[in-house]
Amino acid sequence: MTRDITERKKAEALILRQMKELSRSNEELEQFAAVASHDLQEPLRMVSSYVQLLSRQYKGKLDGKADEFIALALDGTVRMRTLISDPLTYSKVAAKHVELHTTSSEKTLQNALVNLQGAIADSHASVTHDPLPAVMADEMQLTQLFQNLVGNAIKYQKDGTPKIHISAAVDGDGRWDFSVQDNGIGIDPKNFERVFGMFQRLHTPEEFAGTGIGLALCKKIVERHGGNISVESQAGQGSTFHFSLAASFEGVPLAA
């Protein structure tokens, strides 16, 4: 009996040590991503400025191949800017203290839609929502959460007009369960966990642009608010993302 207890304690100590090492490793990776992303911004800004200058001064004055090469370089700088800014945003969310206040989720959704107005106009997307509640949240992070989920719903479409609907209902624990439903390309159930991982992509860059960080950022935001995020979907049949947030301590049931 004594030997069994000793072995169990050794195993528990080993697991605890490994968990601490993993946590430290994750923190170091996040710090590296933040530093690398920050330090890469200035040289990329310089490259982008000079390529734009070339485009303005020499477009149409050289041969067709030159115009094509300059256009490719411009496109490359745009994609590089996204590759740099997304990890930086993730690391900032991971490091920032979450300031919880009574927040109108309807207002934060509207802020997100303003940020997405270009994509909404280009795709002719229809974005509707039910009356949404006041919750305990960091307003900027909740805006980012809605922006990522609605932005993905607009982006991951093959044919037709994106249709997105946002709703909320109280769950059994008295928390608000939000749903973001779309009519997009859907997700195979075997990839449900994978889509929330860092740099995880289910499609090639040629099919859909992106860094594979968007849903990982959503997961980080929700978890830092003490909630959970999940997805229901079938390939080709649209997706519904669910996330939970605490109700407002002030007892405001619905946004005005």
Regions found by a protein language model. Give the residues of each.
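PAS-family sensory domains
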Residues: 1-4, 181
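PAS/GAF-family sensory domains
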Residues: 11-18, 22-25, 29
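Short alpha-helical segment of the dimerization/phosphotransfer core of two-component systems
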Residues: 75-80
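Short helix-loop "hinge" at the ATP-lid/N-box region of the Bergerat-fold HATPase_c
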Residues: 153-154
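Short conserved segment of the HATPase_c
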Residues: 187-199, 241
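Short alpha-helical Gxxx[C/S/T] motif in the catalytic ATP-binding
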Residues: 214, 218
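Glycine-rich ATP-binding loops of the HATPase_c
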Residues: 226-232
